[in-house]
Amino acid sequence: GNPPDGAPNGQPGGFGGSGEVTQGTSANTISEDTTVTGTAYTSTGDDENALRVDGAAVTLDGITVDKRAGATSNTEDGDFYGMNAALLATNGATVTIKNAAVNSSAQNGNGVFSYGSGTTVNISDSTITTSADNSGGIQTTGGGTTNAENLTVTTSGNSSAAIRSDRGGGTVNVTGGSYTSNGYNSPAVYSTAAITVKNAKLTANNSESLVIEGKNSIALENCTVSGNMSSTKGSSSSENVHTVMIYQSMSGDADVGTSEFSMTGGSLIGKNGDLFYITNTHCILTLSGVTLKNEDPDGYLLRVVGNSASHGWGTAGSNGAQVEFTADAQTLEGNILVDTISALDLTLENGSSFTGTIDIVDNAEGG
């Protein structure tokens, strides 16, 4: 079904999904085990992949994939199942991609899409560029797996996370590379999956940098992360402005449960609003040796609160957050806000320090 209005980052799509796996057509399909070198694949058709690998073990070296035109008739099918993506791996395929260039200028044309349990994409030393709305860089759904190493991923459209997941989640492992989003509602990482990123640069130039939805996770090691959410143009800017958002949307795209965020080493820079915003979920938050910087003097280090429910995130007055926050060899500076329907358990260990205040405020909805 459709997400609540204003689900951040537009990750769940609109127009009403078909409710069944609908992947459209493909200009080129590989369904037998093979190795391909230096081939160019293009698509200009609606609901059409430029290249689909269906159920086969395939190695692709030095290929180019260009989704030049053609829109989806249904953005949920594009977001959930890979319809209209430039390159789609599906039906238990194992795809190894090296030295590739993948480009998409099509609406809802995700770059490299891994769909379904048993499907694995291994991609390295490649570039992925998308320019239209609802077009993530690497997208993983339905229990698929993506392993990415040394990629340069750039997205320019709105609702186009560089590392993106959606209904059914999966597993994403990223090592090295740079991931940059330039649109609104387009974090560097949007997680409805188990996502691990090591030694990468994650930059959201007009959005929050990281989002976890529901019973899912992001684990970062030695990453350089920055976010710059718009105060007005984000789909949830009226609710809060922040750099990291952890929430439960109730759209059905992520199971309800504990969200987990961990960051070891590296840096996290927020240019607007709060550094961390957590609402309508239970969260385990762990920071270890991270350089934190909030460039907004009015922004909180951490905001743990309910929300207005105007976007469908639970019921106003009872949609607070419960956060277990462990700081390990970590310097924390800044204020923390917790409302009366939320709870924070803060543990400082291994020489950690906290300089700031913890402000307890009434829930805005009277909960």
Task: Locate each region found by the language model.
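Disordered, low-complexity segments in secreted/periplasmic proteins that are enriched in proline
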Residues: G1-Q23, M250-G252, G312-W313, G366
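Beta-strand-rich solenoid/repeat architectures in extracellular/passenger domains
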Residues: G17-G19, E32-D47, V58-G82, A93-N108, ...
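Extended, small-residue-rich solenoid/repeat segments and analogous flexible loops
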Residues: G17-I30, A321
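Beta-strand repeat architectures
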Residues: S31-D33, V53-V58, A89-T94, I341-L344, ...
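Surface-exposed intrinsically disordered loops and tails
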Residues: G70-T72, S238, A309-G312, E365
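Short consensus segments that form the blades of beta-propeller domains
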Residues: T75-G78, D253, W313-T315
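Extracellular beta-solenoid/beta-roll
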Residues: N294-D296, G312-G367
